[in-house]
């Protein structure tokens, strides 16, 4: 019983699907997918209760969301372990994700009150009131890299605003989604307010194309996001929020503390085995002795990064990638870059057949004439040597994406020069570019999204504004308009 529809756990009626631990191939979850007919039932269930959920009022909805926060707190160890087993991420990292899920509740409440609450102003024409109303039934498509935190960042603000939800998680992390729904159930969420449909492409297509959904919130690949964007092109009445990936640049310029720089580069490129949408993919290092020394130090540090299973002791920095297929894809990406003229400084290797375990890679692509503008979603960092700062910024901007970017530089003037010219939604200075604040918006430009920033701005796409001019009774104006007599 792995589908949660109309408050009931039911079996999927589609084909069999299995989730395995990518570090050792242990079966984590095994069931059947939801059929298009079951997706339809889920959407109908969400539609049936949506108005009642909205009319319950914000305070009553908030009480249930707060009860969910209590469930997250009580079960954070189980959440962290489930994420670790299903994604292969090390336990220290999944504990951080479980904590972020808890923190998201307070941030979402603050965002709702600040960006989509109710306000009144007296005007000569009457009382001007701004309110916000939910879109209705929204679909949430979750990713595998943060299977708890990222869908949580759509679901919580959607519910606070009064929407009901049909949640389709990644087929690679179904157990995490199942655990989330069990916690919502324990929190006392009314039947039908969230419905869970587990499945692969067929399930996703049935949900995305359903005529009765009012919006879709997606986190995932640029390829899938573009398909959804094309699909919704003729439906302006539906809200579509896309958070996609990036070919993210990091520039190094004039840093005295090379050890700190190496640390921030590693945290930018290799955390989560490179499976964060904000991970650095391209590193720009100045030519010359200083750049040579930094690169040598980085090369040595990358070689010493510890890779291991999710539960290894002492804990590794990098766990497994999400699957063996993903791991082999990174080996192939490295091979392609070498064939184009790249030189491996640290070779990325597939550590163990049948698993997602890979070692981190570092490759100098300075001699590659036509560098592919691709998001290689794994622990492979491309190095480009430069001589001129403007040249480095131009190269950094030479991408169809625009999610995150950063510069490590001791000079604030260099940072401000970079900030004014770089094209990205997240721009960090002397910090890893995978670092983002939940109290700020999260999103990019270009192929990285469709101008629907999430995190603190998720409240914006979960409700629409309703502007009213009001008076307590009908009354004549002091002066009638010219040409009128009553």
From Swiss-Prot:
Record keyword Cytoplasm present: no
Pathway: Amino-acid degradation; L-arginine degradation via AST pathway; L-glutamate and succinate from L-arginine: step 4/5
Domain of life, source organism: Bacteria
Molecular functions per Gene Ontology: succinylglutamate-semialdehyde dehydrogenase activity
Pfam families in the record: Aldedh
EC number(s) recorded for this UniProt protein: 1.2.1.71
Family annotation (CDD domains): ALDH_SGSD_AstD
Residues bound to NAD(+): 220-225
Active site: 243, 277
Gene Ontology terms describing biological process: arginine catabolic process to glutamate; arginine catabolic process to succinate
Keywords: Arginine metabolism, NAD, Oxidoreductase
EC category: oxidoreductase
Catalyses which reaction(s): N-succinyl-L-glutamate 5-semialdehyde + NAD(+) + H2O = N-succinyl-L-glutamate + NADH + 2 H(+)
Similarity comment: family membership: Belongs to the aldehyde dehydrogenase family. AstD subfamily.
Role: Catalyzes the NAD-dependent reduction of succinylglutamate semialdehyde into succinylglutamate.
HAMAP family: Aldedh_AstD (MF_01174)
Protein name: N-succinylglutamate 5-semialdehyde dehydrogenase
């Amino acid at each position: 019983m792995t589908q949660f529809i109309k408050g009931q756990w039911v079996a999927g009626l589609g084909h069999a699907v299995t989730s395995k631990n990518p570090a050792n191939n242990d079966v984590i979850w095994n069931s059947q997918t939801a059929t298009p007919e079951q997706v339809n039932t889920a959407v109908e269930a969400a539609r049936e209760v949506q108005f009642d959920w909205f009319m319950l009022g914000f305070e009553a909805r908030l009480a249930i969301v707060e009860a969910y926060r209590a469930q997250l707190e009580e079960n954070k160890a189980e959440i962290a372990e489930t994420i670790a087993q299903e994604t292969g991420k090390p336990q220290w990292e999944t504990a951080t994700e479980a904590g972020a899920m808890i923190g998201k509740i307070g941030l979402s409440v603050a965002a709702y009150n600040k960006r989509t609450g109710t306000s009144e102003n007296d005007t000569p024409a009457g009382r001007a009131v701004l309110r916000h109303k939910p879109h209705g039934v929204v679909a949430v498509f979750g990713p595998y890299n943060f299977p708890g935190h990222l869908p949580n960042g759509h679901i919580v603000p959607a519910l606070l605003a009064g929407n009901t939800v049909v949640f389709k998680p990644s087929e690679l992390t179904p157990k995490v989604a199942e655990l989330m729904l069990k916690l919502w159930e324990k929190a006392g969420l009314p039947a039908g307010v969230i419905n869970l449909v587990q499945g692969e492409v067929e399930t996703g297509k049935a949900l995305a194309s359903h005529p009765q959904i009012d919006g879709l919130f997606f986190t995932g690949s640029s390829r899938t996001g573009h398909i959804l964007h094309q699909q919704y092109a003729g439906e302006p009445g539906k809200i579509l929020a896309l958070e996609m990936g990036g070919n993210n640049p990091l520039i190094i310029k004039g840093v005295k503390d090379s050890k700190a720089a190496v640390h921030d580069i590693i945290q930018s490129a290799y955390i989560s085995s490179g499976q964060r949408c904000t991970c650095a993919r391209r590193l720009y290092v100045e030519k010359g002795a200083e750049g040579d020394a930094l690169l040598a130090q980085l090369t040595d540090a990358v070689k010493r990064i510890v890779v291991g299973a999710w539960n290894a002791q002492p804990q590794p920095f990098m766990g497994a990638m999400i699957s063996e297929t993903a791991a082999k894809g990174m080996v192939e990406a490295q091979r392609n870059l070498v064939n184009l003229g790249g030189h491996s400084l640290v070779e990325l290797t597939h550590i163990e057949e049948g698993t997602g375990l890979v070692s981190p890679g570092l490759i100098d692509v300075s001699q590659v004439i036509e560098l592919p503008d691709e998001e290689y979603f794994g622990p492979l960092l491309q190095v480009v040597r430069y001589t001129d700062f403007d040249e480095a910024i131009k190269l950094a901007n030479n991408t169809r994406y625009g999610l995150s970017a950063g510069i490590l530089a001791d000079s604030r003037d260099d940072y401000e020069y970079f900030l004014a010219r770089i094209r990205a939604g997240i721009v960090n200075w002397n910090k890893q570019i995978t670092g983002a604040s939940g109290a700020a918006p999260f999103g990019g430009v270009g192929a990285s999204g469709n101008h629907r920033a999430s995190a603190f701005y998720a409240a914006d796409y979960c409700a629409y504004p309703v502007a009213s001019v009001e008076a307590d009774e009908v009354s004549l104006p002091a002066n009638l308009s010219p040409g009128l007599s009553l």
